[in-house]
Every structure is written in C-alpha cells, then in structure tokens.
C-alpha cells in the first residue's frame, strides 16, 4: 500500500494512506489533535484536572503520580513522545504500553518533524529511541517514563484492570470497522482499572453506543481542530 508523508495544518507531519484516504493523525493538525484528545482530555483530566479548563475536582484516589497508559495504535510514536514530555514537565511516573500490529518503518519515522514542531529539539534522540528499543520488553527511557511496545492485534488484549488510561487511536471506523466493536471495547473495559478512562478522537454514534453497551459512562467533549466532538469513556 502506498504511504506518503504529508504536512498537516499545524505544521507537523503525518503518514497518509491514499488507498484508504486515511492518515495516522488529523490533517487539521497532528500535534494539536494529540494534545487535545490524549493529553488534555486524558492525562491532564486524570492527573491534573486544574490544567483542563472547566474541569471538575476529582477525588484523591483518582489522582496518581504513577500512571499506566495503554495506547491502541502506537503508530508514529507521537502520542508516546508528547506523553513522555508531559511526564517530565508534571513530575509524574508513567508506564506506557504501545500496541501496534504493523510497526512504522524507521525510514518514515526519520522524516517526521515532531521534536522540532514541539520545540523539543534537545529530545530528538529520545524520540528516535522510542522507535529503536526492542519490542516486547520494558525500557526506561527517562527517569519518569518507561515504555513497552507490543507487536500484536488489538483483539489480543486480554489484561484485567491493568491501566489507568487508554489512548484509543486506531484507524477510523470507516476503514477498519472491526476495531470499533463491542468486542474490542469490552476488552478495553476489562483492561482498565476502576475509574480508568478511555479517550478517542472518534465521536460516531455507533462507537458511543458500543462503549455504553459494555458498561462505560461516555461523555461527548469538544473535539480538536476539524472535529466538533470527541469521546471520553469512564469505567465506574
């Protein structure tokens, strides 16, 4: 399948699949989407709600300086890299698990400009390291951030109450509807700890209903640039 590197509206690059007319990140801004969906409405909401405008206070047992995150669709590593930067900034420890069935090749990774666009040029080698470390083993990347990359299908996730946050960043339901089913979301529900959250860029009604049908409490939230809404699901 043909794969092109394209520039998005905020200046950051992503990978475009012409055959599917699908991108790894939003064409309206790869970095803006990642920050809004996964950091602001995910990590900040759970750990530092005061950073989220209009956020309600959370009880003490919902706050933690030791967070376990599962990413569904490790892809370019953008979400992992931004989360690493936030872990250092907020002084929180994160164990990050990135699941990817079809890893992106290093020749594509080397073309991406995320460290530059994030004003994190000094961490460019860290971004590369996220991709160079071996799969299926934990790696301490910084004092606050460890990563385990897992080369497997999303349907193979069978962990129980293991994660505080799930970044659900699979390709869209238009091109891969099998990734947005009740079966998948039941696995996600089981994998989350109590009061854990799942955040995703999608706001499709069928996705929201699939989440609700397996037990999630689902919120519609304002979306990133180019999207009216997104979803956050809580295991309560």
Task: Label every model-predicted segment.
Residues 179-194:
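A short glycine-rich, Lys/Arg-flanked "PGG" loop and its adjoining helix->strand segment in the class I
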Residues 65-75, 83:
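Conserved class I S-adenosyl-L-methionine
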Residues 1-46, 66-67, 85-97, 101-118:
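Rossmann-like AdoMet
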Residues 214-236:
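Core SAM-dependent methyltransferase catalytic element
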Residues 53-64:
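A cross-taxon signal for low-complexity, glycine/charged-rich
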Residues 110-159:
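S-adenosyl-L-methionine
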Residues 194-202:
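Conserved beta-strand signature within the Rossmann-like core of class I S-adenosyl-L-methionine
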């Amino acid at each position: 399948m043909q794969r092109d590197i394209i520039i998005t509206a905020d200046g950051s690059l992503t990978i475009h699949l012409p055959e599917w007319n699908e991108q790894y990140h939003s064409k309206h801004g790869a970095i803006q989407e990642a920050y809004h969906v996964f950091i602001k409405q995910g990590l900040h909401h759970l750990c530092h709600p005061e950073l989220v405008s209009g956020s309600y206070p959370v009880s003490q047992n919902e706050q933690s300086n030791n967070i376990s995150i599962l990413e569904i669709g490790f892809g370019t590593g953008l979400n992992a890299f931004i989360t690493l930067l936030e872990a250092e900034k907020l002084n929180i420890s994160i164990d990050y698990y990135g699941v990817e069935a079809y890893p992106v090749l290093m020749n594509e990774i080397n073309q991406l400009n995320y460290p530059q666009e994030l004003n994190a040029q000094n961490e460019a080698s860290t971004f590369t390291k996220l991709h160079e470390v071996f799969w299926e083993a934990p790696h301490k990347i910084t004092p606050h951030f460890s990563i385990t990359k897992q080369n497997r299908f999303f349907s193979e996730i069978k962990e129980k109450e293991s994660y505080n946050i799930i970044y659900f960043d699979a390709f869209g339901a238009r091109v891969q509807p099998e990734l947005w089913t009740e079966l998948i979301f039941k696995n996600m529900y089981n994998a989350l700890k109590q009061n854990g959250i799942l955040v995703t860029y999608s706001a499709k009604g069928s996705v929201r209903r699939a989440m609700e049908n397996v037990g999630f409490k689902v919120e519609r939230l304002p979306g990133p640039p180019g999207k009216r809404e997104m979803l956050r699901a809580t295991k309560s």
